[in-house]
């Protein structure tokens, strides 16, 4: 098995922490980024594990994202997988057709920032995988969901020649797959995402 470096945002969430634990259990190195890195350590465990780097990250701040990516590169030498929780969980019934709400703008800006943040390293490596986890359509504002899907599709076409794959995966599917998979099946599930 090749050791990879995973960059996981929203790492203190239930799904984020599970992804971090599974990647570590498979021998990978993980940058676990969240607004509260101490919560990551509480959920994930061993802060002494040299393969785990827990970082504070506001994904909306491009400079913070750049600094987190640089910290990951300095510590591990590359980034092979980005798993980003691109979520705006406001109900569709609360959609306001006026100016975009802050949470919509923040979700889309975070999506752009983390993708742009890791792409240079992945291009230079000639490989990488970017997975944006999105909420189920019924729990997600349509404009945010379609912004994420459209962005992923466009970026996937742009970066395919560099060996970088991009996908959007419903978070509930990722959670169900991780719960149902065991042993080597979990490796497959994580790679399929």
Where are each of the predicted segments found?
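Conserved glycine-rich Rossmann-like NAD(P)H-binding loop of the short-chain dehydrogenase/reductase
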Residues: 26-41
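SDR active-site lid
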Residues: 157-193
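Conserved glycine-rich cofactor-binding loop
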Residues: 12-13
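Rossmann-fold cofactor-recognition segment
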Residues: 47-63
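Hydrophobic positions on the long internal alpha-helix
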Residues: 68, 83, 114-118, 151-152
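Catalytic Tyr-X3-Lys loop
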Residues: 96-112, 123, 127
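Rossmann-fold scaffold of SDR-type NAD(P)-dependent oxidoreductases
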Residues: 9, 79-87, 107, 132
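A glycine-rich helix->loop->beta "capping" turn
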Residues: 49-50, 71-84, 90
């Amino acid at each position: 098995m090749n050791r990879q470096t995973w960059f996981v945002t929203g790492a203190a969430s239930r799904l984020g922490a599970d992804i971090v634990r599974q990647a570590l259990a498979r021998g990978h190195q993980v940058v676990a980024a969240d607004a509260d890195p101490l919560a990551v350590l509480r959920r994930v465990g061993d802060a002494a594990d040299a393969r785990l780097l827990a970082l504070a990250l506001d994904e909306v701040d491009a400079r913070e994202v750049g600094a987190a990516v640089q910290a990951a590169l300095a510590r591990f030498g590359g980034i092979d997988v980005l798993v980003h929780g691109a979520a705006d969980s406001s109900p569709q019934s609360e959609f306001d057709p006026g100016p975009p709400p802050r949470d919509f703008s923040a979700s889309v800006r975070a999506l752009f920032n983390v993708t742009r943040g890791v792409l240079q390293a992945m291009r230079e490596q000639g490989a990488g995988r970017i997975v944006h986890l999105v909420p189920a359509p019924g729990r997600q504002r349509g404009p945010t969901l379609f912004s994420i899907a459209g962005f992923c599709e466009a970026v996937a076409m742009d970066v395919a020649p560099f060996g970088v794959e991009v996908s959007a995966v419903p978070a509930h599917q990722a959670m169900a797959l991780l719960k149902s998979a065991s042993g080597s099946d979990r490796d497959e599930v994580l790679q399929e995402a």
